[in-house]
Amino acid sequence: MAVKKFRSFDDFVPTISDSEEDVPDLDASDDEMEKKPVKSSKTKNKSKKKAKQQQGSHLDEDVHEDLNPEFQFSIDSGEVTTNFAGWDFQGDEKSDEVEKKDVDLDGIIRRKGGLIMMAATGSDAEESLSEESEEEPEEGDEPGESDDEDELALDGFGMGVKRKATEENEEDEEDEEEEDDDEDDDKKTEMSQADLGKGKDEDEDIEEDTKEEMAEFYAPEEESADAKKIVHKTFNSLSLSRPVLKGLGSLGYTSPSPIQSAAIPIALLGKDIIAGAVTGSGKTAAFMIPIIERLLYKPAHIASTRVVVLTPTRELAIQVADVGKNIGKFVNGLTFGLAVGGLNLRQQEQALKTRPDIVIATPGRFIDHLRNSASFSVDSVEILVIDEADRMLEEGFQEELQEIMSLIPSKRQTLLFSATMNSKIKQLISLSLKKPVRIMIDPPKQAADKLTQEFIRIRKRDHLKPALLYQLIRKLDNTSQKRIVVFVARKETAHKLRIVLGLLGMQVGELHGSLTQEQRLQSVNNFKSLQVPVLICTDLASRGLDIPKIEVVINFDMPKTYEIYLHRVGRTARAGREGRSVTFVGESSQDRSIVRSAIRSVEENAESGKALSRNVDWTQVEQVNSLIGAKGDVVEEIIEEEKQEKEILRAEMELRKGENMLKHKEEISARPRRTWFQSEAEKKNSKMLQVLAKNKKPINSKKRKQQEALAENPRLYKKTQKDRVEYQERQYSKKQAAYGKKGKKGKK
């Protein structure tokens, strides 16, 4: 049949792929030609509608079968992305296991009447009128400032600074406005001024590294000075390869930041670096770009881990991994591994077995994998990066960091980066640095240039802080279109504030250590996508996290140090954008010293933003506080209901765990026991030492010098028992003599 059909065409030459069905039958009538495609479409796709089948011709069907209707031609080269949405916080890929269920706190709040609509405290007209009448700008204000912001009166926070005559007049006006404060409050302010003066002397008395020590430890200053002088306007002048430039272009990076311009050439030379720059200046890319550039010349077909990046928090590690993947996505064969706590351990083991080129990790999970994961080693590590190095050198990470240093090859390049890099040489010696180049782009302990720092004096109104927070968020963002981060000191405070604000109708997320890693990542992603415009978190989120377009940072509780304050406010005003921070300031000397440091930094640097005092309508705040007080019983009910649901989930988890132990007993018992570099007793001791170190008062330079002298030159003569007895007798005779003098005075 096929041969007969092909013979009817004079010019047609059949091939092996041709079939009888593909050849059109020209002898058939037009009716038959119209019916055939309808029949074939019914047999192939029964789900198609009859109207589409009758309208579609044979040519249209061929087009739909051969081309994907969702295919689109890309006119752009794909190298530049202007609308970069930020880094990915998804972590590991989802496993096949059933996800753990969490308590639906928002559902409980809705059942109790929250998250329905915003609580109203008065009309917008009344609010605007009260704000305009109460928050008038003073004489010294700049014309560009808003009505509710005043130039920060330094004496108001205990600052003994010389002021002009006009400023003295302003101070008198402020005193008249604050006549309602009692004398005790004024006395407390004077006491805090004295405390601040003392604190200032102690800060100045802190011993710094001498010039001789710095010259011996660091590389010559000429190297860092030359690196700062050379300004690279584009990444092309840094002599980077095309795959790296293409990756930077896909992220929208056009010109390097000052820290990138200074650090990348030195890092490409293989030298050790200690670098510091303000938050949001691109420090992650400053070490990732030279690392990826050097890995382009790695030996082919030899899988080994050559780079280790250590970070203090899990979220920061996930973000650094995403930065590296985006920069190196056009580099062939470049692999990344993630080793952080809270995520699937088995998945991480499988990924590390492939020996990825770059491993980003937190210290604890990294040591766990080194000791217990097969086929993972760090014998070939060439580069070690410690991000947020000042935090990693503190008490909580010292022992883990020493263990990692003992396992990683000493012949390596070490890169240290942080926004507050003020670690002493004595701390850095343990890292085995080899003449590191010190690159400090900005003055130490400085905030971003376009950051406006605002301060609110709480005085004796600590109980009004939740109401003040609600009123402030409503005023700053009435449409829930801004991202606002609220920092608190305790996890319990973050959780309770979420419930209180939820009952007032505000959608709020929380981020702290009591949440599981899945919950933490979900909170960050919801905040990033503006599903939740307000994120209440502890200092867990104060370092490194780069979420685009965070407009406002609110310090509900004051941090312990000025360095932590800088990291907190550094979540906004990143990468040249404008930002605002609002801080609730108490009457303690610690709070005032942090404010004083912030103001001093603004005064010393002309381009370092503004420091303003924000006035508050406390009558409206008290109205909100009355609403919160009325919902006090509901808050306790929500906490109790959540606790009960958590207990049920925990019982279900224990039940599943017991079933698995019975079902897979042999397999579980056959697994090797996981080990750690510390015993249980050593773990407890280290935790106790950490707690004592946090509560320990800082010693002055005189005592520190005495302790260092004793440590370096211990006593050559050891006391005997006879010496101790004689010493006790002398002390006893002194006490008796002193007691006798007191007795004689009493008789007189």
Swiss-Prot record:
Biological processes annotated in GO: rRNA processing
Span of the annotated motif Q motif: 233-261
Subcellular location: Nucleus, Nucleolus
Keyword Hydrolase: yes
InterPro entries: DEAD/DEAH_box_helicase_dom, DEAD_box_RNA_helicase, Helicase_ATP-bd, Helicase_C-like, P-loop_NTPase, RNA-helicase_DEAD-box_CS, RNA_helicase_DEAD_Q_motif
Positions that bind ATP: 277-284
Coiled-coil spans in chain: 632-667
Location (main, coarse): nucleus
PROSITE patterns to which the protein is assigned, alphabetical: DEAD_ATP_HELICASE, HELICASE_ATP_BIND_1, HELICASE_CTER, Q_MOTIF
Region (Disordered): 1-72, 111-211, 687-748
Record field: compositional bias (Basic and acidic residues): 58-67, 720-732
Record key words, sorted: ATP-binding, Coiled coil, Helicase, Hydrolase, Nucleotide-binding, Nucleus, Ribosome biogenesis, RNA-binding
GO CC, one annotated term: nucleolus
Gene3D superfamilies the record matches: P-loop containing nucleotide triphosphate hydrolases
Catalytic activity: ATP + H2O = ADP + phosphate + H(+)
EC top class named in words: hydrolase
Residue ranges of the motif DEAD box: 387-390
Keyword DNA repair set for record: no
A GO term for molecular function: ATP hydrolysis activity
Enzyme nomenclature, EC number: 3.6.4.13
Function of the protein: ATP-binding RNA helicase involved in ribosome assembly.
Similarity-based family: Belongs to the DEAD box helicase family. DDX27/DRS1 subfamily.
Subunit: Associates with pre-ribosomal particles.
Recorded domain comment: The Q motif is unique to and characteristic of the DEAD box family of RNA helicases and controls ATP binding and hydrolysis.
Name this protein carries in UniProt: ATP-dependent RNA helicase DRS1
Native species: Kluyveromyces lactis (strain ATCC 8585 / CBS 2359 / DSM 70799 / NBRC 1267 / NRRL Y-1140 / WM37) (Yeast)
Classification of source organism: Eukaryota, Fungi, Dikarya, Ascomycota, Saccharomycotina
